[in-house]
Amino acid sequence: MYKFLVFSSVLVLFFAQASCQRFIQPTYRPPPTRRPIIRTARQAGQEPLWLYQGDNIPRAPSTADHPILPSKIDDVKLDPNRRYVRSVTNPENNEASIESSHHTVDIGLDRPIESHRNTRDLRFWNPREKLPLPTLPPFNPKPIYIDMGNRYRRHASDDQEELRHHNEHFLIPRDILQD
C-alpha cells in the first residue's frame, strides 16, 4: 500500500507539472489574410469579368469575355483534358515517339526531350565515371608541408662544436638573430 501511495503521488505531481504548463506563443504572427473578393451576379451585371479592377490584379483580356469581339479570334483551341508542353527547342523535338522496325508509337507531348534548363549531370547512370571529390578541409584535406629548418637556426655562439651536441634544444628564430 505504501508503494502505491508513493507511486500515485509521484504520478499526480508529474501530471500536474505536464498539464499546467503554458503554451509558448510564437513571437512572429503573420498579418491576417484578406478574405477573397466574391462577386455576385448582381454586382457584375453585364460587364465582362476582365474589366473588373476592384482587387487590382492585372488580367489579360480574353476574347471570350469581350462584349463586341467574337470568340472565334482565339486561334489556340486547347483541350482541357490533355496536357500540353511548350519547348524552346525545335518543334520536331516536342513529339516524343518510340520507333521500332515495323511501326511508330506516339506517346504524346507530355514528355519533352530537351526542355529542361539548368539541370546538372551527376552521372548516376554511369557509376564507373568518378565524380570530382571536394578538396576543402572538412571533406578531403590537403596536407600542408612547412619547412621549419629554414626559419630556425642553431644558437649563435662562438663555440659551434659544443652546440652540435645540443642542436635540438637551442633553436631560435632567424628573425631574432640578424647577421
Swiss-Prot record:
Top-level taxon in the UniProt lineage: Eukaryota
GO cellular component: extracellular region
Glycosylation sites: 135
Keywords assigned by UniProt, alphabetized: Antibiotic, Antimicrobial, Glycoprotein, Immunity, Innate immunity, Secreted, Signal
Induction (free text): By bacterial infection.
PTM section of the record: O-glycosylation is important for the antibacterial activity of lebocin.
Function according to Swiss-Prot or TrEMBL: Antibacterial peptide.
Annotated family: Belongs to the lebocin family.
Name recorded for this polypeptide: Lebocin-4
High-level lineage: Eukaryota, Metazoa, Ecdysozoa, Arthropoda, Hexapoda
